[in-house]
């Protein structure tokens, strides 16, 4: 008799229904096709839940399959002001997860962590083993702005690294720079929902009406429009050099600082249209003449492995990007440009491309799909 795959309790960093899914949601949804998953969303307080129309008892309406279970833990507000409240919230979180695990009859699950801040969950849930998924250089993120915050993150990450049976790292360079090598460490770069974004190539997929109204040619971006990641100055300067091109940014503005609206992007040919439902994104990307990854180059982004690269390529769209190390492996399928003048020139040049590289883009995306990546990860889990 084949042994049933071990259940997973995932301490997630994003809500499962977040309109801009990351590898956290993509990975767990696909693992739930083969094994049971308890997806523990970031804790919130009851006031937030009532305002958002969520069930204040900690349940959620998201139920993607019989194997995917979602818990929205409830904690007390003001933890950032009080160490006592923060400690109490940690106990509340553990208690709620334990209760749900008992209800689901999870026995010795895999504990899957996505942040060093989750170190306090280790050894509290009766887990058989810990899997740690490193997606970023966490100490370089906006939430670690002070030396004390960075020091805590480093210490917490050491705790997680020591406990983890498997460490999955999305950036090869991050693994090399941090010396994360050996049998426990697995470089698993980000990939894309190729089938979903490949829908942009199908004749029956119609361009979204608001994109058709903007008109082309369109240089487009999908993702969080935030100053810590997007080089607004470069984008604005490139847009001023190309008044004939519509620059369209699709996604929430100001994730790190929601009050931030980039004034430098208030240009007649720049359109910030806000987030759109994930299911409808192929109809938006279909309107792109060129796709953009205009990231700042800094301590955080130099280790980024953008999912959007393969999302764009799956739609057959040419890509212009700043010089992120992870993008260099795509070769001539991505045009690298590091200053406003060369970025504007690169976008114009991509507009003149014929479809000679389209199939190569699609083929590269197909080699970097979630279906392939899940096979790799499942093989690692089954060997242990």
Predicted regions and their residues:
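Conserved donor-binding/catalytic core segment of Leloir-type glycosyltransferases
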Residues: 210-229, 236, 366
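Nucleotide-activated donor-binding/catalytic signature segment of Leloir-type glycosyltransferases, i.e.
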Residues: 258-285
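Membrane-proximal helix-turn-helix segments that form the acceptor-binding/catalytic region
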Residues: 27, 95-102, 123-124, 148-167
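A charged, aromatic-enriched C-terminal amphipathic alpha-helix characteristic of glycosyltransferases
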Residues: 352-381
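Carbohydrate-associated surface elements
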Residues: 170-173, 188-200
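Nucleotide-sugar-dependent
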Residues: 18-22, 279-284, 291-314, 321-331
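Glycosyltransferase donor-sugar binding loop
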Residues: 246-259
